[in-house]
């Protein structure tokens, strides 16, 4: 059984806040490798700037994840009318709001690319935008396990997957402990 792991970092950050604990990415890799050949592991993250979360991203890479990033979109707090004309002041810059970086396309491209040499996908996300991707992967014969948190996963996505695992049920296996940065597997 060949397995691929895909982690929507934005979705999982909020899911972990909801359950009240954070998982250790290394423990997740180890769990995903049990009973299967873990052929790829992807982590998707939005960034405020290119240096944002650099140590964390480096640690993920050292563990064996392929890390994909996109900049967060920034919106002005005043509706953007002045900033659209090039006028800005300190009040506006203090009211900046960052919104989600949409990495759904990257997730889809990666999973469709590895699909021909994969039997199973573990997807950690709650995004409704991925439901059609999951349907297509299942139509290609892949088994899809969705891991997320009750109340933070779109019904359409959950219904599209073969199996749903509530993140809270994995706490004994995944909860963050002491940092370890040895690779769990080698990317091929």
Residue ranges and their predicted role:
Residues 1-188:
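Terminal and domain-boundary accessory regions
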């Amino acid at each position: 059984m060949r397995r691929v792991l895909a982690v929507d970092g934005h979705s999982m950050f909020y899911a972990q806040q909801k359950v009240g604990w954070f998982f250790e990415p290394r423990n997740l890799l180890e769990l995903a490798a049990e009973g299967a050949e873990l052929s790829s592991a992807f982590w998707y993250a939005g960034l405020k700037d290119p240096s944002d979360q650099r140590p964390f991203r480096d640690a993920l890479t050292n563990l064996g994840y392929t890390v994909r990033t996109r900049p967060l979109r920034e919106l002005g707090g005043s509706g953007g009318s002045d900033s659209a004309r090039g006028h800005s002041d300190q009040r506006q810059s203090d009211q900046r709001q960052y919104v989600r970086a949409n990495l759904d396309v990257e997730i889809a491209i990666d999973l469709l690319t590895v699909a021909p040499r994969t039997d199973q996908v573990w997807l950690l996300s709650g995004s409704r935008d991925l439901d059609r991707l999951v349907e297509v992967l299942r139509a290609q014969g892949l088994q899809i396990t969705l891991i997320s948190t009750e109340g933070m996963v779109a019904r359409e996505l959950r219904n599209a997957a073969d199996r749903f695992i509530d993140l809270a049920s994995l706490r004994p296996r995944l909860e963050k402990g002491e940092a370890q940065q040895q690779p769990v597997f080698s990317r091929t």
